[in-house]
């Protein structure tokens, strides 16, 4: 189980990313349209003004039940350990164990 503070920090980053997403997208679109170099530098400065934690690269997928940051399956939102336990307990419909 991940510490509560790490999970809260990740939730805060998600909210910040949603808040500043439109600003980042519009300034990136402006950079592609502007031709003069000095204007581009001004827009780059504006792009650097939002907080660092609002960048989408700072986000990390976490397990829905445990908060584990590694070995996550996107389809289920679970880590590999929990996914395996739930499949063995028949809690995930449509998921089958491999046996050969």
UniProtKB/Swiss-Prot annotation:
Pfam families listed in its UniProt record: Ribosomal_S14 (PF00253)
Listed InterPro entries: Ribosomal_uS14 (IPR001209), Ribosomal_uS14_bac/plastid (IPR023036), Ribosomal_uS14_CS (IPR018271)
Keyword 4Fe-4S: no
Compositional bias segments (type: Basic and acidic residues): 7-20
GO process annotations (BP): translation
Disordered: region residues: 1-22
Record GO terms (molecular function): rRNA binding; structural constituent of ribosome
Cellular localisation: Plastid, Chloroplast
GO cellular component, one term: small ribosomal subunit
Keywords tagged on the record: Chloroplast, Plastid, Ribonucleoprotein, Ribosomal protein, RNA-binding, rRNA-binding
Main location: plastid
Assembly and oligomerization: Part of the 30S ribosomal subunit.
PANTHER family named among the record's database cross-references: 30S RIBOSOMAL PROTEIN S14, SMALL RIBOSOMAL SUBUNIT PROTEIN US14M
HAMAP family per record: Ribosomal_uS14_1
Family: Belongs to the universal ribosomal protein uS14 family.
Free-text function comment from the UniProt entry: Binds 16S rRNA, required for the assembly of 30S particles.
Protein's UniProt name: Small ribosomal subunit protein uS14c
Record lineage: Eukaryota, Viridiplantae, Streptophyta, Embryophyta, Tracheophyta
């Amino acid at each position: 189980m991940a510490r509560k503070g790490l999970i809260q920090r990740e939730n805060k980053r998600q909210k910040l990313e949603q808040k500043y997403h439109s600003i980042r997208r519009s300034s990136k679109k402006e950079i592609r349209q502007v031709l003069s170099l000095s204007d581009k530098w001004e827009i780059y400065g504006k792009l650097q003004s939002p907080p660092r934690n609002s960048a989408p690269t700072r986000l990390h997928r976490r397990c829905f039940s445990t908060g584990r940051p590694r070995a996550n399956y996107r389809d289920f939102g679970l880590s590999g350990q929990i996914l395996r336990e739930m499949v063995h307990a028949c809690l995930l419909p449509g998921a089958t164990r491999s046996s050969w």
